[in-house]
Every structure is written in C-alpha cells, then in structure tokens.
Amino acid sequence: MNVIECMYKRRSIRKFQEKAIDEELLLTLIKAATAAPTACNSQPWEFIIITDENIINKINEKTYFGKYNAPSMIVVCGNMKLAMSGPVKDFWVQDCSAAIENILLAATSMELGSIWVGLYPVESSYRPLYKMLNLPQEVIPLGIVYVGYPAEEKEPRTQYDEKHVYWQKYEERKHRSRKKNTKFNK
C-alpha cells in the first residue's frame, strides 16, 4: 500500500485481540516514530513501551481518557532537557505529535490497530504517570498509543471537507460547529 492509501486506511481502533505483539515489531514502530521531523533536529522525544498487563491496567485506571484492551502501549513523552527554549520551547508538542502520527501510520502498514490518546496538557491525565513510570519532572507524557492486532475492521476514509480549505487567505464562511463538551469546560 502506498502512503496515501495508508493514511486513508488508518483509523482509530478501539477493540484489540489478546494476541501479544512481537518486540521487534514494537521497535519498528519506534524507529518509524524517530523518522519524524523535529524543530532544529532537537529530537525531544522519549518512548516507553509497555507490554505488562498489570502496568497497562494501572495506567487505564489512573488516566482520564481511553481505556482500551490493547496488549501494548507506547507512552510518548517530551524531554524538556532536549526541547528547544525561548519562544519556541513548546515545539516539542509538534515534534512528538509527528512521531505519534508516524507510529500510527507504521502500525497501519503492518496490519496492526492503534489509537492515540492525548494526555498533555490535561494535567490530571498525565500527572499520575510520573510515579507509575518513574518519570523525572522534565519528561512530560504527551500521549499514549495503544497498539495491537485489531478485533474490529473499519472502512478506509478521509475526512476531507472543502469548507475547511482556503486559497491565498482565510474567508469568513459558515462552518459546522462542534457542541461544547461540558466535561472540559469546568
């Protein structure tokens, strides 16, 4: 499958088989992640691969979002000692997000299912991981990628909508709006 087909095929998989993923495949996902671009080649990322069911369950109990039955998870973190400083200090979020997208695409190309669950900037979501994963304060968990063999199939798609595309400059137009999620507006 070519890259465009892989992008359309990539979907958030929420149901996984109990079958474990070989360590070599998990390392291939990390190698794909580190092929992502970073601002000034800073590479501020750290990856924690978790295959221990007890640890996965504890993380699922403590984090706010996503509680999936995948046999593996990759916690993608930004290391502030490696991140840029000054007005571009938050570029680590973009860098690590690009790495996560590479993991998702690589997983799809390998017939694995995956889903990205965001942690940062919701402190109540990422803070519990510090103790569980022995993280130093300068390492911030950005997100979790659950990975496994899919137990569900979803049709390939794109969410392209020409109402969100502009040529040369932004124009005021009527857009679809999203209902406010009161869960996060407290």
Model-derived regions: residue spans:
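Acidic, surface-exposed loops and disordered segments
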Residues: 1-186
